[in-house]
Amino acid sequence: MIPGEIKVNHALGDIELNAGRETQTIQVANHGDRPIQIGSHYHFYEVNDALKFERENTLGFRLNIPAGMAVRFEPGQSRTVELVAFSGKREIYGFHGKVMGKLESEN
């Protein structure tokens, strides 16, 4: 085995990422003058303000792409992306500091 190598049993078929998780598809446009790249685990609600979309609907979501991947938006480009809900504790810290804690309040 090579360090970092992943052995996959192809007989089992395709692996479905984020199975059973809430997703949404949105249209995003880069109104800026520079390319913007968003990584796989970045809280989409907090991405660069030059990206225009229905931001309020993306609270608690990230891109539904494999870990370590990214999506690049060129200036003037508009594209459709799929988002997936964060799971686990659903606590978000950092990024742009727009959300610093739990996504849902405890009852």
From Swiss-Prot:
Claim: Nucleotide-binding is one of the keywords in the record: no
InterPro entries linked: Urease_beta-like, Urease_betasu_sf, Urease_subunit
Keyword Membrane in record: no
Predominant place of localization: cytoplasm
Entry GO CC: urease complex
GO process annotations (BP): urea catabolic process
A Pfam family that the UniProt record links to this protein: Urease_beta
Compartments (UniProt record): Cytoplasm
Keywords of this entry: Cytoplasm, Hydrolase, Plasmid
Pathway(s): Nitrogen metabolism; urea degradation; CO(2) and NH(3) from urea (urease route): step 1/1
GO MF annotations in UniProt: urease activity
Induction text: The probable operon is induced by urea.
Subunit structure, interactors included: Heterotrimer of UreA (gamma), UreB (beta) and UreC (alpha) subunits. Three heterotrimers associate to form the active enzyme.
PANTHER family with a match to the protein in the record: UREASE
Name this protein carries in UniProt: Urease subunit beta
Species name: Escherichia coli
Organism ancestry: Bacteria, Pseudomonadati, Pseudomonadota, Gammaproteobacteria, Enterobacterales
